[in-house]
């Protein structure tokens, strides 16, 4: 449950406000001087009226002069209805802000061509952060105030009212003083929060103060009591001008465009010297939408886009490294958890630490208040559930596939020339296993030929009901001729399905062929290894990539072109950029022995897992010269040069056996067995023996093409994939957005825990509290109603944006009527009602959002940085649009649009003076003794928040005095 912990001075301030409002609402007399000056007609304006006027939507509650008890009842009804409408506005504003978050999160892919010709692709946000904060974000947080002003003017025959403008000024005062006071106070003692984009804050603060100064000018100086068309239009056009100025400050344009600062190291240690000079030429080209948008960096907005791209790349890399670090820590901390649980924890932790927009905090605050739960925890849990459910769905789909698929178990088979036959397995998966399936097979020549290397084979395989695999055999022909490795193919074709089979296996009926088909692989490749050669030994490929998480990597040493005899093949690991000795891998060496007819041997090397997001290190595995352990007697004799033999004293077939020993690196085997009748080292070989010797030499084991394997250790594919998926899931637009109406209705009727305990790193959802249930049932009507709003998935959020702002406008019209009727029922003027009650009601969600942002965010921009910009936007849009429409309407009718300058001009002037004090204090707090706009030592916090609350109380107090004519206004 989200609790707004207010400092004592703030809570006491709210009580004083209520007391002041009630006090001035029941003043029955005015001072003699004031009454003499104003006369009887002004007395009614000073004291307020108990006679209500017809609203834009709501009619007058008759009779107009009820009893005291009826007044209390009516006031209660109006007040409760107004509060309930505020809840509705908060919930639809939640949808509205979600659409804004999705809209401003849109990205565009660009191609960057570097001077060396290398091209890279990256994405940049379409919306600049500052521009989005001053336009859509400000509109989202201030939509009720802006629309109230427009609706009030348009709904009352284009005449000026007190409710809309006073709400804008009152809301600005509440934001500037109370929200900032709360943000200063809630930061833990000793911690500080600074504004990151200080230039933007200066610009928006200046425009905020100028906006209210401009209001005073057009009300009391330029044309007192009359708003002309040019004044209204200029007020509105100040809005885009303000946005452009803020964007310029954010992008460091203008002066920065022409002056390039360079930095060099001074002679003194630690000294950095700055000097100005020409910007170096750059030929980095950026291609967007197929067009080169700049050929030189200095010709494109001071390289703003290049800087943004570079910053984005750095941010992405930093995010990946941070995600990898978090996953590694969580795996060490929770070794018992499954990967889905670890992903959920990491997702929640990263989302909690990520810098968030004003829109997100507004949405989070609203959902916590209304029992919709912690959006981050819900998102993390939903993602974990989706991952598990998708896995189950895929498994179920595989098991319940309505189509029978026929395919080979594997696509490649190997056999020796002397194996006799090779067995191939055909599989049946999916479909109705109660039927009989037929499939034809047929061999086809490759480099191996039928009749000389293998037996041509064709036929039909029958899968009877319940059978899921069958085996076919193809005969292999052996010869004594040395040959290269050869291969041939076996194809599957013509799948048929039948329900009945005769006793002799003949198909009785053939139907429903659409429920069976060939799967993959439907062709098998059989490789025949020659067995008349000792073998050629090689790795499969010269380079292999392995994941650092593989643990024990296995490398195959292949024996091709023969497999006769026992052969020893030595190997060893060699360091490259990867280090042995257990740092990146463990040093390994050995001498595996290939047995007769054995064609594959596996070498195992242990790889050390560092769990790095990016890794690219290499080492090598090298095989040495193969050594023949045993050969046929005749070939052994022919392989060795005659001479230097040692008589063993043994005989074979009546002939003596000799042995000759060579060094380890000699190409001839170390030990051979020879047979000779009459040994003569000078005896020449016959031509037949020479031919046999040549053939035997060809059959000697040799090394093949790939004797040195380069092993590239890369980051874990699974680990990197998990990190990348989490990076995508940590897009806040995905967190706050919705994909379907079904999702919205489920969310609307679901109660979730509103606990805002972000220290709980588990990120797991908790059970809802009693407060969560109460708030849910109070707001379930609004939740279900606004679930009909289009999801943010449609039109990239614009459909939700349009419908939401229409709903906010409708509710705002009700709020304006209820507030006006509430005020006239108890005798409060519209200006006082707007400044106190309406401004407070529209600012409550922003108050909670700022409080959460102040405690969670690293900087103060999200909590108070947008307050000044929002205040300026309120004037330029809320008053600028409304007064422009009214001024144009009256000018078209030959009339003047009259606005009483008294109360509004006084409030504006008072607010402007206090705003100067507020901004000055905030800037002073950046001094080293405090360290930032928010937080700091406890004494400084209390003094600052007390001062700001006092400024707000004084603003309410003096505005009320002026409204009831106790002090003279303008």
Swiss-Prot record:
Annotated binding of Ca(2+) 3, by residue: 417, 479, 481, 483, 530, 532
Annotated TM spans: 72-92, 134-154, 168-188, 202-222, 229-249, 798-818, 822-842, 872-892, 904-924, 942-962
Region spans: Putative calmodulin-binding region: 251-270
PANTHER family given in the database record: SODIUM/CALCIUM EXCHANGER, SODIUM_CALCIUM EXCHANGER 1
Name of this protein: Sodium/calcium exchanger 1
Record keywords, A-Z: Antiport, Calcium, Calcium transport, Calmodulin-binding, Cell membrane, Glycoprotein, Ion transport, Membrane, Metal-binding, Phosphoprotein, Repeat, Signal, Sodium, Sodium transport, Transmembrane, Transmembrane helix, Transport
MF (Gene Ontology): ankyrin binding; calcium ion binding; calcium:sodium antiporter activity; calmodulin binding; transmembrane transporter binding
NCBIfam families the record matches: caca
Major place of residence: membrane
Record: residues binding Ca(2+) 5: 548, 610, 612, 715
Gene: Slc8a1
UniProt note on tissues of expression: Detected in heart, kidney and brain (at protein level).
Signal peptide annotation: 1-32
BP term (GO), one: calcium ion transport
Physiological role: Mediates the exchange of one Ca(2+) ion against three to four Na(+) ions across the cell membrane, and thereby contributes to the regulation of cytoplasmic Ca(2+) levels and Ca(2+)-dependent cellular processes. Contributes to Ca(2+) transport during excitation-contraction coupling in muscle. In a first phase, voltage-gated channels mediate the rapid increase of cytoplasmic Ca(2+) levels due to release of Ca(2+) stores from the endoplasmic reticulum. SLC8A1 mediates the export of Ca(2+) from the cell during the next phase, so that cytoplasmic Ca(2+) levels rapidly return to baseline.
Binding annotation for Ca(2+) 6: 584, 610-612
UniProt binding sites for Ca(2+) 1: 417, 453, 479, 483
Chain residues that bind Ca(2+) 4: 453, 479, 483, 486
Modified residues (Phosphoserine): 282, 389
UniProt xrefs under InterPro entries: CaCA, CalX-like_sf, Calx_beta, DnaJ_domain, Na_Ca_Ex, Na_Ca_Ex_C-exten, NaCa_exhngr1, NaCa_Exmemb
Species whose genome carries this gene: Mus musculus
Membrane topology designation: Multi-pass membrane protein
Similarity comment text for this entry: Belongs to the Ca(2+):cation antiporter (CaCA) (TC 2.A.19) family. SLC8 subfamily.
Parts forming coiled coils: none
Keyword field contains Zinc-finger: no
Residues exposed to the Extracellular side: 33-71, 155-167, 223-228, 819-821, 893-903, 963-970
Compartments, record wording: Cell membrane
């Amino acid at each position: 449950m989200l609790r707004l912990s207010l400092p004592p001075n703030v809570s006491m301030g709210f009580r004083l406000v209520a007391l002041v409002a009630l006090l001035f609402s029941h003043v029955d007399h005015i001072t003699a001087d004031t009454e003499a000056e104003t006369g009887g007609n002004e007395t009614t304006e000073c004291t307020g009226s108990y006679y209500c006027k017809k609203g834009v939507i709501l009619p007058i509650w008759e009779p107009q002069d009820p009893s005291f008890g009826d007044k209390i009842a009516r006031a209660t009804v109006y007040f409760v209805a107004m509060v309930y409408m505020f809840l509705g506005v908060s919930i639809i504003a939640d949808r509205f802000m979600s659409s804004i978050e999705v809209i401003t999160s849109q990205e565009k892919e660009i191609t960057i061509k570097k001077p060396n010709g290398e091209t890279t692709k990256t994405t940049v946000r379409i919306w600049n952060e500052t521009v989005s904060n001053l336009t859509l974000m400000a509109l989202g947080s201030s939509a009720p105030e802006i629309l109230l002003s427009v609706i009030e003017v348009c709904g009352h025959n284009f005449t000026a009212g007190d409710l809309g403008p006073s709400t804008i000024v009152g809301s600005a005062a509440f934001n500037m003083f109370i929200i900032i006071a709360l943000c200063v106070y809630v930061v833990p003692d000793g911690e500080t929060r600074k504004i990151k984009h200080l230039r933007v804050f200066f610009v928006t603060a200046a425009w905020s103060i100028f906006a209210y100064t401009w209001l005073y000018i057009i009300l009391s100086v330029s044309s007192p009591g009359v708003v002309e068309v040019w004044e209204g239009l200029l007020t509105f056009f100040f809005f885009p001008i303000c946005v452009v100025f803020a964007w310029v400050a954010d992008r460091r344009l203008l002066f920065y465009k022409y002056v390039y600062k360079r930095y060099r190291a001074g002679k003194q240690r630690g000294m950095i010297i700055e000097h100005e000079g020409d910007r170096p030429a750059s030929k980095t080209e950026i291609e967007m939408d197929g067009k080169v948008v700049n050929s030189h960096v200095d010709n494109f907005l001071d390289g703003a886009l290049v800087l943004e791209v570079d910053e984005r790349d750095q941010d992405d890399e930093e995010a990946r490294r941070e995600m990898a670090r978090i996953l590694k820590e969580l795996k060490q901390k929770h070794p018992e958890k499954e990967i889905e649980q670890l992903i959920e924890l990491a997702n929640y932790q990263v989302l909690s630490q990520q810098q968030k927009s004003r829109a997100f905090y507004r949405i989070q605050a609203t959902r916590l208040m209304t029992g919709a739960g912690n959006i981050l925890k819900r998102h993390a849990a939903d993602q974990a559930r989706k991952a598990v459910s998708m896995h189950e769905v895929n498994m179920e789909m595989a098991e319940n596939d309505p189509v029978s698929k026929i395919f080979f178990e594997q696509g490649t088979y190997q056999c020796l020339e002397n194996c006799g036959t090779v067995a191939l397995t055909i599989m049946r998966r999916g479909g109705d296993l109660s039927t009989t399936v037929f499939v034809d097979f047929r061999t086809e020549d490759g480099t191996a030929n039928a009749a000389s290397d293998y037996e041509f084979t064709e036929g039909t395989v029958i899968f009877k009901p319940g059978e899921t695999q069958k085996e076919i055999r193809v005969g292999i022909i052996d010869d004594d001729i040395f040959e290269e490795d050869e291969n041939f193919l076996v194809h599957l074709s013509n799948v048929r399905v039948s329900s009945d089979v005769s006793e002799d296996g003949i198909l009785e009926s053939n139907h429903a062929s659409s429920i069976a088909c060939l799967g993959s692989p439907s062709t098998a490749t059989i490789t025949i290894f020659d067995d008349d050669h000792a073998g050629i030994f090689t790795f499969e490929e010269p380079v292999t990539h392995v994941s650092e998480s593989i643990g024990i990597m296995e490398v195959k040493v292949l024996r091709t072109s023969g497999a006769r005899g026992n052969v020893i093949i030595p190997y060893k690991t060699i360091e490259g950029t990867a280090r042995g000795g257990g740092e990146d891998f463990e040093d390994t060496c050995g001498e595996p022995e290939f047995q007769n007819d054995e064609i594959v041997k596996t070498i195992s090397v242990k790889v050390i897992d560092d769990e790095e997001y990016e890794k690219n290190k290499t080492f090598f595995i090298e095989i040495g010269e193969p050594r023949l352990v045993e050969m046929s007697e005749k070939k052994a004799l022919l392989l060795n040069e005659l001479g230097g033999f040692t008589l063993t004293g043994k005989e074979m077939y009546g002939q003596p056996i000799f042995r000759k020993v060579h060094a380890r690196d000699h190409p001839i085997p170390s030990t051979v067995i020879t047979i000779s009748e009459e040994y003569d080292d000078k005896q020449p070989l016959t031509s037949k023996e020479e031919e046999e010797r040549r053939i035997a030499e060809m059959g000697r084991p040799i090394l093949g093409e790939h004797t040195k394997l380069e092993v590239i250790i890369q980051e874990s594919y699974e680990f990197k994939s998990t990190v990348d998926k989490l990076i995508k899931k940590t897009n806040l637009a995905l967190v706050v957005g919705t994909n379907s109406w079904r999702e919205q209705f489920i969310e609307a009727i679901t109660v979730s825990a509103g606990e805002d305990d972000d220290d709980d790193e588990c990120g797991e959802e908790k059970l809802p509290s009693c407060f969560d249930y109460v708030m849910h049932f109070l707001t379930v009507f609004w939740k279900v109603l606004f679930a009909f709003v289009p999801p943010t998935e449609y039109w990239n959020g614009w459909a939700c944006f349009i419908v939401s702002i229409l709903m906010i406008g409708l509710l705002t019209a009700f709020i304006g009527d209820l507030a006006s009727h509430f005020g006239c029922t108890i005798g409060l003027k519209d200006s006082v009602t707007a400044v106190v009650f309406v401004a407070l009601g529209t600012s409550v969600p922003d108050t909670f959002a700022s409080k959460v942002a102040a405690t969670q965010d690293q900087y103060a921009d999200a909590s108070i940085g947008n307050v000044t910009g929002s205040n300026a936007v309120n004037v330029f849009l809320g008053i600028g649009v409304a007064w422009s429409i009214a001024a144009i309407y009256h000018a078209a009718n030959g009339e003047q649009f009259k606005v009483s300058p008294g109360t509004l001009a006084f409030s504006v002037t008072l607010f402007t003076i206090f705003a100067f004090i507020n901004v000055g204090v905030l800037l002073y707090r950046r001094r080293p003794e405090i360290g930032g706009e928010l937080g700091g030592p406890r004494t400084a916090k209390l003094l600052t928040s007390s001062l700001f609350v006092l400024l707000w109380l004084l603003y309410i107090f003096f505005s009320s005095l002026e409204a009831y004519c106790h002090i003279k206004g303008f």
